[in-house]
Structure formats: structure tokens, C-alpha cells
């Protein structure tokens, strides 16, 4: 069965109605002041931070071409076995509990071979929904004792809060437990951790949390004394090593989407506050993992706005202390017809590589063709390597985002993202703690419509012109005769949670935008028989009703349309 992404009606309507702009009208050249303090650290680029989701239905996952593309993008982590399917996946038999779609060359050993070729660390999602602690412990034994793979990170379930506990039993996540409450999940989570660490004490266990600001965060179902996050952490915080959130901020326009990274600081601050409350002396070692993110719930999924969103999102999460960020997805597929977003075809597909899907009489590029989102992620290779120091930087205009990194060779790399679809941006840069060499600088850029990164000598360290809708990374060397900056001093770590304010647009999980019972997300849609989520948001009232082929979810007065569970035929 195909579990594939379907973008909802509100997002599609937003695309057809046009998108917002972050800069003045066409023709105006915006001047933006950028400040970089190379002497103040805001974090370290994590060793396995740049991650990507894979799935058991993706027959091209381990091909030489696909592995080469992932390696070139320096993907450092691969997640397996794939989203909501993980709660139905049985690793020993390479089968789904509901008889769902898998392909022969995507079992665990094949996945590990792919991870090795790419040079990526695996992060595995143990089956909570239809599995047991013993099944998970057996997986640890096979992976780390029998095979010597050394798999370190293990999630316990996918979006377990989507099991129907908050929606009268109508959820998207497989969960065969009679009790679907957060209390029961937490008790079982402790049991999973105990069983798995008995086999290999070095494994790290992750707890599924709701994302602050997104449904069902802060909800309490009948009989609950607290919401999901407080309940789970109050019971299990001392048994876990990392917490898991999924980040799908969306937006009704591309401008909304590109503004959402500004909300990440509030999300991480709230998570840190929760961890500190419940984990005690263990709190400082509990990591934050964002194991799914992309531009779902916005007009752009494959076009340039999504490409700009990708590196901005990765780097902002790293600046806030996240140690893993995994994009959804390697291949995805869709039954949605392509749209036009800012003059560019958007294939409405969450994959970074084309799945070769045809819909609405139009076909994607040949399978494995990189979408702009791939190049957005690959742009990070020009900015940072694992272990590099992220330093403080700021922009005086939200139309240009900035991220800066002190490289291991003593240089300074500065990524500039022009979010205006129409206007070039004149940028004036100032530096503290680093004196850049004079003359033209090496830049690595990705512009709208490009099919590769471009390296050139352009502008100076103090002045650059950024094309519309572009990513430009300056690779600066210290001035001759000057020492590179001293080791950057650490920035203060926030201790109090700041309010999480939802941006206009939508918020939710990827699974809420999928056909809830098809074959895996990576498999192309054969017959276009699925619905999609139009809009959802944090609220207390959730009701369900049937409307034709759709499940209508009323969330506090907002409508969400979700494809009803159905079985589909398969085709290539």
C-alpha cells in the first residue's frame, strides 16, 4: 500500500491565488545590513546533523546514482524505516503489519549498506504501534551485537500522539495498544529503553513529543491529568537520551513559509524547559532531534522557496542546539497535479529527488532528477562541516537570512539567503572577531532555475549583490598578516521558555497530509485515489465526519481534509 504525500486544498488554493513577497516591488534593490561576530559561538555543527528520511517502499534508495547524490550533498544521517510505516514495520520479516507495501531490496541490511555507501549514520524507528520491547531489543542485538553496525540512535515509535487518543479514536498512526494515552506510551517507553539498553548500554533512546505550537500540543483528552509532553516526560525523562519533534510549519504563502525559521527559537526553548523540569541532572545531556521536516502545508514543496527554506531551517535548528534534522524525504511521490509558484513549476512532492510521478496530465522529470530542495540542502556543503563552530550573525532585514560558521582551517563562511522572489538585494557586511582578506571572494551560489551549485569570484567580503530567490555562501580567508579570530566564546543558553506564536498558515504533521493507508511514501501513486489535509491548527475541539472520499476533521473551527484509509493497486 502506498503512503504518499498529498497536499491539501488550502495550500493548493494559496498557490493558485499567488504568493506573498518579503521585499519591495520588482525593480527595487534592497540594501540589507549584515553583522557577523566571529568571536561569539552559538553552537557546533553536529556530526550527523544533516539528515534525510528513507522508506521501505523506495526501490531506488540504494542505487549507485542515488547514493552518489546523497554523498555529494554530505547527508550525514539516514532515517529508517520511514515515517508512519515504522509503527507497522517488522524488521525480522521485512513486512508491514497491515500487509502494506515493501520492496525486497529495502530491508534493514540493504538500508545499512546504503548508509555505509553514503557515509551516513543510521537513526532507526522501533515499532511501537504494533511491536513490542522484545522485538526492538532483538533488533538492537542483531544490529549491534550480531552484525556490528553500531546503530546509536533509536526512536520509539513515530508520531504516536496521532494514534487517535486526541480525536475519538480517529488517527493516522498505527497503535494496537488498548490504552493509547500518553501515560501508557511513557510506561511502555521505559520498558523499551530498559530492554534495548540491556542488550547494548550505548544505544540512545528517543521519546516522541508533540511539537510546541502544533496540534495536539497542550491538548488533554478525557481522563488525562496533563498534556502529552508533560505526561511522557514526567514518567520517562530519566530513561531517555533525546526527544523527537517533527517540524512542518507551512504557510499560506511562500513568504509565510520563509519566515517560519524565526519560530524555532521559541520551540527549542520550550522543549529545553520541559527537559529541565523532568530530567534533573540528566537534562543537559538530553538531545533534541527533528526527525522530519519539509515545506508541507505551504504552496511550495519542490520549487525555489522550499529550496531556500531547507538550509535556513537546518542551520536555525543547529543554532538552537538540535543535533539531528532529517528532511522528508529522499523519494516521495504524489498524486497532485503540478502547480506554478513564482513562475516555477512545483511538483507538489516532498522528495528531494523526483519519483517520476505523473498527475493531472503532467509528469515529473525522470526519476532521481534532483529537485531544487536537493540543491538547497547541498548548499550547506559550502557553509559547514561537522565540528565547525557556528558563530553569531544577524540581518537588519528579514528578507535576507544569514548564517555564519568558523571553518576548521581558520576561515569564515557566511551563507546569505535572499527571500525575495523578484528583487536583488544589495548587502553590506560588517565583521567582529575576524578580518577578511581584501579583494574578490569565493562564492558558492544556487539561484532559481539552476541545476547545480555555481562557484565564482564575486564581490567583496563587505559588499555583495544577491540575485532574487538565491542562496549565496561567501568563503572568506583572514587578511594577510592577521591572526584568525580567537576561539569563539559561547553564547548564553536560554533557560526560560518563550511563547510559541503560530504564524499565519497551517501547522501539522506530515502524516496528516498523507493518504493514511497507501503504500510507502516513496512509491508513485498509481491511480490518484487519495485526499489531502487542507488546514489544521492547535485547538481543543476535534471532530470527524465523512464527506465523499474525504475525512473532514474540524479542529477548533478550522477544517482539515484527510484522505480516508483505503487500499490501492500498485504500479511502477
What is each stretch, according to the model?
Residues 15-25:
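C-terminal segment of classical bacterial N-terminal signal peptides
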Residues 546-572:
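C-terminal membrane-anchoring or membrane-association module
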Residues 503, 509-548:
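Extracellular Ser/Thr-rich, low-complexity/disordered mucin-like segments
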Residues 295-378, 388-401:
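Aromatic/acidic polysaccharide-binding cleft in carbohydrate-active enzymes
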Residues 181-316, 320:
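Noncatalytic carbohydrate-binding groove/subsite architecture in carbohydrate-active enzymes
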Residues 396-435:
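Carbohydrate-binding surface patches
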Amino acid at each position: 500500500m502506498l503512503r504518499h504525500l498529498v497536499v491539501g486544498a488550502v495550500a493548493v488554493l494559496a498557490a493558485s491565488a499567488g504568493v506573498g513577497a518579503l521585499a519591495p516591488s520588482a525593480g527595487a534593490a534592497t540594501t540589507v545590513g549584515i553583522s557577523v561576530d566571529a568571536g561569539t559561538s552559538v553552537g557546533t555543527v553536529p556530526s550527523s546533523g544533516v539528515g534525510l528520511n528513507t522508506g521501505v517502499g523506495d526501490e531506488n534508495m540504494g542505487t549507485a546514482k542515488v547514493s552518489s547524490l546523497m554523498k555529494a550533498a554530505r547527508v550525514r544521517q539516514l532515517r529508517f524505516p520511514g515515517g508512519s510505516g515504522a509503527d507497522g514495520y517488522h524488521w525480522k520479516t521485512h513486512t508491514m503489519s497491515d500487509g502494506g507495501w515493501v520492496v525486497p531490496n529495502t530491508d534493514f541490511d540493504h538500508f545499512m549498506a546504503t548508509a555505509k555507501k553514503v557515509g551516513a549514520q543510521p537513526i532507526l524507528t522501533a515499532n511501537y504501534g504494533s511491536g513490542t520491547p522484545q522485538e526492538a531489543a532483538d533488533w538492537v542485538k542483531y544490529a549491534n551485537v550480531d552484525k556490528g553496525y553500531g546503530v546509536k540512535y533509536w526512536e520509539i515509535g513515530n508520531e504516536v500522539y496521532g494514534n487517535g487518543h486526541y480525536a475519538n479514536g480517529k488517527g493516522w498512526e498505527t497503535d494496537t495498544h488498548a490504552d493509547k494515552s500518553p501515560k501508557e506510551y511513557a510506561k511502555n517507553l521505559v520498558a523499551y529503553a530498559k530492554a534495548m539498553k540491556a542488550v547494548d548500554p550505548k544505544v540512545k533512546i528517543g521519546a516522541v513529543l508533540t511539537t510546541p505550537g502544533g496540534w495536539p500540543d497542550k491538548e488533554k483528552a478525557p481522563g488525562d491529568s496533563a498534556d502529552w509532553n508533560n505526561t511522557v516526560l514526567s514518567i520517562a525523562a530519566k530513561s531517555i537520551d533525546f526527544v523527537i519533534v517533527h517540524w512542518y510549519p507551512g504557510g499560506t504563502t511562500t513568504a509565510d513559509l520563509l519566515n517560519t525559521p524565526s519560530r524555532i527559537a521559541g520551540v527549542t526553548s520550550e522543549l529545553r524547559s520541559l527537559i529541565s523540569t523532568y530530567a534533573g541532572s540528566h537534562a543537559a545531556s538530553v538531545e533534541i532531534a527533528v526527525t522530519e521536516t519539509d515545506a508541507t502545508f505551504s504552496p511550495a514543496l519542490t520549487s525555489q522557496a522550499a529550496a531556500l527554506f531547507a538550509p535556513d531551517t537546518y542551520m536555525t535548528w543547529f543554532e538552537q542546539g538540535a543535533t539531528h534534522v532529517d528532511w522528508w524525504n529522499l523519494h516521495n511521490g504524489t498524486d497532485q497535479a503540478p502547480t506554478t509558484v513564482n513562475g516555477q513549476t512545483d511538483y507538489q512532492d516532498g522528495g528531494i529527488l523526483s519519483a517520476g510521478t505523473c498527475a493531472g496530465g503532467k509528469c515529473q522529470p525522470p526519476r532521481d532528477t534532483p529537485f531544487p530542495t536537493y540543491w538547497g540542502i547541498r548548499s550547506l556543503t559550502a557553509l559547514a562541516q561537522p565540528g565547525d563552530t557556528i558563530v553569531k550573525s544577524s540581518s537588519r532585514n528579514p528578507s535576507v537570512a544569514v548564517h555564519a560558521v568558523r571553518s576548521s582551517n581558520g576561515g569564515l563562511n557566511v551563507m546569505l539567503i535572499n527571500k525575495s522572489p523578484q528583487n536583488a538585494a544589495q548587502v553590506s557586511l560588517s565583521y567582529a572577531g575576524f578580518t577578511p582578506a581584501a579583494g574578490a571572494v569565493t562564492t558558492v551560489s544556487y539561484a532559481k532555475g539552476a541545476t547545480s551549485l555555481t562557484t565564482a569570484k564575486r564581490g567583496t567580503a563587505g559588499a555583495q549583490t544577491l540575485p532574487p530567490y538565491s542562496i549565496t555562501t561567501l568563503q572568506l580567508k583572514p587578511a594577510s598578516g592577521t591572526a584568525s579570530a580567537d576561539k569563539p566564546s559561547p553564547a548564553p543558553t536560554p533557560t526560560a521558555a518563550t511563547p510559541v506564536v503560530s504564524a499565519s498558515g497551517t501547522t501539522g504533521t506530515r502524516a496528516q497530509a498523507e493518504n493514511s493507508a497507501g503504500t510507502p511514501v516513496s512509491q508513485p501513486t498509481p491511480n490518484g485515489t487519495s485526499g489531502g489535509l487542507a488546514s489544521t491548527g492547535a485547538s481543543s475541539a476535534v471532530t470527524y465526519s465523512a464527506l465523499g472520499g474525504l475525512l473532514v476533521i474540524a479542529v477548533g473551527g478550522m477544517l482539515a481534509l484527510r484522505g480516508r484509509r483505503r487500499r490501492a493497486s500498485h504500479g511502477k
